[in-house]
Structure formats: C-alpha cells, structure tokens
C-alpha cells in the first residue's frame, strides 16, 4: 500500500505516515510505498524523516520497494528541478530503496508561448529525465515515471517518452487504472507498455458515459468528457 492512500487522514494531524505504516501491516500487506515531498510534518529534514519512516517499516516487517516524489521538468528553470529531484534520489539511496518514481510534467507553465503539443513537452523534458536516471544509476537507484497527469498519460505518449529518454535505468510505473482518465482501454494500454514496467499500482475504475447525467460526488471528468471514479 502507498502512504498516499491515507492522504485524507493526514489533514487533521491526528493520523501520521507512521500510523499508515502500522495500518499497512495490520491489513496483512508485505510492503509499503513511501510518498514524500520537500516538506515534513515534524520539522525534520526530508532525509531524517524518510529514514525514520523506513526504519519503522522495517520494524513492522515491511519491505519498502519504492520511493515516490513529485517532479515537473516542463518549467522555466528545469535545472533547479533536477537538482531538487537528485536530493530525493540521495534519500532513496541512503535508505537503500531500489526504485524512485517521479513525475515528468504537469502541464504548460505560466508564460509559455510555444505550441501546446505533448511532443514539445517530451522534447523539453527528456534531457533532464535522462540526467536523473543516470545520477540515480550512480547511486544504485532505478528511476521510473507513471502514466499520470493528463499531459503524458496515454500509452502512445508514454511510449514516445521512453523511446526518447532511451536510458536503461529508466522504467515505467504502470498504474492499471489511470488510462481510464484519458479514455483509453486499460488492458490494451498496459499490454503496449509491458516491456517497460518496473512497478505496478493496482487500481480499478468506475466509468460512466459523458453523454449521461453527472453521476455525482466522487466522479471526475476524463479528457474526453466521460465520468470516472476510483474504486480502490
């Protein structure tokens, strides 16, 4: 289970990521995915916080196969984003977590005046994704990215990204349900990317046609205007 699965419970401060690890063990799982960013809830450094979580997971007998954090290389200063991401790679390396998942791009940044094409985005981010993969290789960590964020979420676009990065230390975190968000058949999409998969998020979706009425609370709109809702 990912610590992100408990995200709503962290908001009031009464439930922590340490509690999430305990609950993961209680559910009978064998491992936990640590999802962390640049801030910590207790004032410790990201390195200190991650090490404490990792140690707690190990005390509970849980494996920590992957470290997840955000990233966005389609920005005005991608060099700074690469430097920031490398600090998270250092954390994963120090904790001996073998895999790190990072985002690639979240959308067109404010002030962008170029052609709004995902191909332009791929062209811009590839050098930095590749540099992150190489830096991680030197630290004994493998990097990966997920079909996530609308802009680079379809299987065809992800395939273009992996072909362009072309680095043996960079793979695909396959979210089985996220293809629904861009109106793609999940089974077909997963099959197309199977050679690149290094980690999987198991997820199922409820889907309703956008030609019908809004099904209500909990449903979101896909890129094509259909309704979807996660079930796991």
Regions found by a protein language model. Name each.
Residues 92-118, 139-152:
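Active-site groove signature of glycoside hydrolases
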Residues 1-99, 117-120, 127-130, 137, ...:
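N-terminal pre-domain/capping segments
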Residues 31-32, 67, 130-232:
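Acidic/histidine-rich catalytic cores of soluble enzymes
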Residues 5-7, 36-38, 70-73, 104-108, ...:
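Active-site-proximal loop/turn and secondary-structure-junction residues that shape catalytic pockets
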Residues 42, 110, 210:
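Glycine/Thr-rich phosphate-binding loops of Rossmann-like dinucleotide-binding domains
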């Amino acid at each position: 289970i990912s610590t992100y699965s408990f995200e709503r419970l962290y908001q009031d401060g009464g439930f922590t990521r340490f509690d999430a690890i305990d609950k993961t063990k209680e559910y009978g799982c064998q491992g936990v995915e640590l999802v962390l960013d640049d801030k910590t809830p207790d004032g410790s450094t990201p390195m200190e916080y991650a090490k404490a979580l990792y140690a707690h997971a190990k005390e509970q007998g849980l494996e920590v196969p992957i470290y997840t954090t955000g990233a966005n290389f389609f920005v005005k200063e991608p060099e700074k984003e690469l430097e920031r991401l490398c600090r998270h790679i250092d954390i994963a390396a120090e904790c001996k977590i073998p895999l790190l998942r990072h985002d690639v791009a979240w959308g067109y940044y404010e002030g962008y005046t170029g052609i709004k094409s995902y191909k332009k985005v791929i062209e811009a981010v590839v050098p930095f994704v590749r540099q992150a993969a190489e830096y991680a290789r030197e630290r004994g960590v493998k990097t990966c990215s997920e079909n996530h964020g609308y802009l680079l979420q379809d299987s065809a676009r992800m395939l273009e990204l992996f072909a362009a990065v072309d680095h043996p230390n960079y793979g695909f975190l396959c979210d089985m349900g996220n293809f629904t968000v861009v109106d793609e058949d999940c089974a077909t999409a997963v099959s197309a990317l199977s050679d690149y998969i290094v980690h999987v998020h198991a997820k199922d979706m409820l889907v309703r046609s956008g030609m019908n009425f809004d099904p209500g609370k909990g449903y979101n709109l896909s890129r094509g205007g259909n309704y979807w809702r996660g079930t796991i």
